Amino acid sequence: MRRGTSIALIALGIASLLSGSSQAAVTVLGNGLARTCFLAAEFGGGSAEEGVKACSDALEQMALPVRDRAATLVNRGILYSRLDEPQMAIADYDKGIAMEPSLGEAYVDRGASLIVLSRYDEAVQDIDKGIAMGSNRLQIAYYDRGIAQEALGNVRAAYEDYKKATEIDPEFTLASSELARFRVVRRHSDGT
């Protein structure tokens, strides 16, 4: 399979990942619109449009603590990703990170949106930061970084990331499918 075709298929995989509920939402405690926004981002209940509205209403109508406001922006970003609006998603991730730079999930989620936009170097940097911060869904982070690494031509790094994702979550079929495409060839000590 040609590299361009492979990257296109990977982009479809990322798009399907973003359309599901596998991005890492940031928890908002209590009741109200911000909590509704979190539940829509985390569990995908209802339509993404309804979730975006709940998030927007929470941001406009509620006096949220800084962390909850940042989390609500990140959660709305996830919902924008599901609506195939990566630029809108990135704008919300940027605002959330500016308010609360310690949200590791925000970096991983922004990295996923950057992959959709073919901004692979930036995606790797963001995902690296999210991993270093201890993102709650490391298997997603490693999978996403593997996609970006493969798109950059860093095949060995991609393999290692897909492998790490399956070590963290052996049931993670997207990573297992990517890993299955690889063939490991051992080299002799003389380089052949």
Q: Model features per residue range: what roles?
A:
Residues 82, 116, 151, 178-188:
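Register position in tetratricopeptide repeats
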Residues 57-60, 64, 95-98, 129-133, ...:
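Conserved structural position within tetratricopeptide repeats
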Residues 69, 103, 137-138, 172:
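Residue-level recognition of tetratricopeptide repeat
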